[in-house]
Amino acid sequence: MNVARQDSRRPAGEATGPDRRRWLGLAVLAAMQFMLVLDVTVVTVALPRIQHDLEFSGPGLAWVINGYVLMAGGFLLLGGRLSDMFGRRRLFLAGVIVFGAASVVCGAAVSPAMLVASRFVQGTGEALAGPAALGMIPLLFPDSRERMKALGVWGGIAALGGTF
């Protein structure tokens, strides 16, 4: 029996396309990566207000951006290795929780030190979540054609985060 005949005998309610849960998983991973990249650049818009409200010095204000980038870049490889050792999903969730909690603290910061410290923690969350998210895509999409599409979607949405 050929494949075309087998496909024509499937029940009408059975899904014939790609598994939607995988694409939903990709949407979650891409949305989080969008937020991680967005968080690097979105602060620049708020810097004058942050400087005024929290009475930052000029050099101190640079640490609002640099703290995040330093931790994210500095621990990116470690985050990837930890996700290999302890599981990508586990590290992704840990990174999201760390990032989210630090974001709340950033929003509630009442001093320059509190804001800078929480930006360092946000960068650490990014270093955990980012590599784990990228590592989950090949697991969700074992077929090379679908994987390339998924990586394109993930990368494109992540790049959009830097434009805001």
Residue positions per predicted region:
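Transmembrane-helix bundle of Major Facilitator Superfamily
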Residues: 2-164
